[in-house]
C-alpha cells in the first residue's frame, strides 16, 4: 500500500501540507504519507513549526529526510493569533485559544495562534536549525514553490523589498514593506 502511494506521487503532486499532522505515523513497515513524500524528491513539504504540532526532533528528522531545499515553514495560524486567550471561531467551529494553541472543546488541536516569526524563532532556538536555513524555508522556498520568487522571497535588486531586521536574539527591530520602514 505505501509502496503504491510512493509510486503514485509521480509528477502529479508537488506539495504536501502539514507534514506529520493528521496522518498515520511514519514507521519502518508502513511509512505512509511521510515516507512517500520523503521518497519523492520533487515534492515540497510544508511543516508547522509552532512548538505544538511537531516535536523539535521531528523537525530535525524532516530536514534530514528531505533536505532544507524541500522544506516550507508554515504557521497554521488562525485569525486569533496575537489576541488574548479565549473563545473564537475557526471555519464556523468554536475553538479555545490558550497561548499559541487553538483547540476544539474536546481538546483536539484545531490550529495554531503562532505567527511565522515565532515559528522561525522556535526552529532556530529549539530545533537547532540555522538562522540562514530557517529564513530560506520561511521565505525563499515558498516563494519559489508558488512561482513568485522573481518578485519576493529574497532581497535582490528589482524585487519587492518586504523584510524585517532582527537582533541576535531574533527580536524584530524594524519592518519594511515595499522598501519603506513601517512603525509597528
What are these regions (language model features)?
Residues 15-19, 44-46:
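Short beta-strands and strand-loop turn motifs
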Residues 170-176:
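Short, Lys/Arg- and Gly-enriched loop/turn segments at beta-strand edges
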Residues 29-47, 51, 58, 63-75, ...:
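His/Asp/Glu-enriched, well-ordered alpha-helical/loop segment
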Amino acid at each position: 500500500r505505501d509502496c503504491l502511494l510512493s509510486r503514485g506521487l509521480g509528477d502529479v503532486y508537488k506539495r504536501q501540507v502539514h507534514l506529520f499532522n493528521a496522518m498515520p505515523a511514519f514507521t519502518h513497515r508502513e511509512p505512509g504519507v511521510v515516507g512517500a513524500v520523503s521518497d519523492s524528491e520533487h515534492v515540497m513539504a510544508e511543516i508547522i513549526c509552532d512548538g505544538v504540532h511537531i516535536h523539535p526532533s521531528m523537525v530535525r528528522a524532516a530536514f534530514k529526510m528531505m533536505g532544507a531545499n524541500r522544506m516550507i515553514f508554515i504557521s497554521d495560524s488562525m485569525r486569533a493569533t496575537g489576541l488574548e486567550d479565549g473563545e473564537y471561531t475557526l471555519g464556523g467551529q468554536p475553538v479555545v485559544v490558550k497561548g499559541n494553541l487553538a483547540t476544539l472543546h474536546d481538546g483536539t488541536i484545531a490550529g495554531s495562534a503562532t505567527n511565522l516569526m515565532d515559528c522561525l524563532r522556535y526552529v532556530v532556538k529549539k530545533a537547532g536549525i540555522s538562522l540562514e536555513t530557517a529564513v530560506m524555508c520561511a521565505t525563499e522556498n515558498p516563494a519559489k514553490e508558488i512561482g513568485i520568487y522573481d518578485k519576493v522571497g529574497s532581497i535582490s535588486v528589482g524585487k519587492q523589498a518586504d523584510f524585517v531586521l532582527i537582533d541576535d536574539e531574533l527580536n524584530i527591530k524594524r519592518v519594511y514593506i515595499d522598501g519603506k520602514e513601517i512603525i509597528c
